[in-house]
Each structure stands twice: as structure tokens, then as C-alpha cells.
């Protein structure tokens, strides 16, 4: 079984409409990039002032277990409101050799390169599966 593409979403207020809006933005982004299915890890009603959140902890465990190849987040504030916490988490993701895509940072050439590589890889894997 291949590695999953994950998305992490978080809202501080327990508002299902806001959470669904965040997920929809990530889904649209993934579709625009030619990315297949995305597994969501969502913390609804959790503060971004620390990293102690159930879905984020499950995502971390899955990354450490080698189950995740890419993580998509809408913006860094979804990970943490404290920029230092957010960067510590992003460094951990990088150390685990997981690609991180931040949707609302499209002008970053590294992000563009990752998205292009990921889209090409996903299409190649899809073609292999169809021709198997």
C-alpha cells in the first residue's frame, strides 16, 4: 500500500461550517494540482496556541510511521498561531522526509516545484495502475 497524501485542518471555534469551508479549499487546491484522494486530519474547536491536539498527534504518528508522503495545510496558522511552534513542526515534517504544501503561499518557487513534481508522480502512478 502506498503512502497517503494528508491534509491538516484546524479551527479554534467548534464551527462545522468553518471547518467544511477549510476542507473545501484544500480539496479544490488538490484537484487543481491533479492530486488524487486526500486523507483529512481535522481538529475542530482547538486552539492554535499549542500543538496538543488529537488529529495533529495522529498525523504526527502516521508521519513517523512512514504512512504519509505529503501534508497539505491551508496556511501556517492552521498548524500553530505561534510562528516558532509552526516552524518547529514544519522542521519535524521536513526531517521525516514528508513534503509540506502550504496552500496560501503559492508564490514560493519551492512549493511550485513540489506541486509540479507531486502532480507528475501522481499521474505516473495512476497510469501505471491503469495499465497493470
Feature annotation, model-predicted:
Residues 1-132:
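Short, structured surface patches at the beginning of a domain
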Amino acid at each position: 500500500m502506498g503512502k497517503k497524501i494528508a491534509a491538516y485542518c484546524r479551527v479554534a471555534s467548534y464551527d462545522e461550517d468553518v471547518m467544511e469551508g477549510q476542507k473545501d479549499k484544500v480539496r479544490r487546491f488538490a484537484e487543481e494540482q491533479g492530486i488524487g484522494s486526500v486523507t483529512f486530519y481535522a481538529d475542530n474547536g482547538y486552539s492554535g496556541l499549542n500543538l496538543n491536539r488529537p488529529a495533529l498527534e495522529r498525523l504526527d504518528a502516521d508521519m513517523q510511521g512512514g504512512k504519509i508522503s505529503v501534508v497539505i495545510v491551508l496556511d501556517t496558522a492552521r498548524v500553530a498561531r505561534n510562528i516558532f511552534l509552526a516552524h518547529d513542526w514544519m522542521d519535524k515534517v521536513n526531517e521525516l522526509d514528508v513534503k509540506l504544501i502550504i496552500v496560501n503561499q503559492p508564490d514560493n518557487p519551492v512549493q511550485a516545484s513540489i506541486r509540479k513534481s507531486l502532480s507528475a508522480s501522481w499521474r505516473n502512478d495512476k497510469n501505471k495502475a491503469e495499465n497493470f
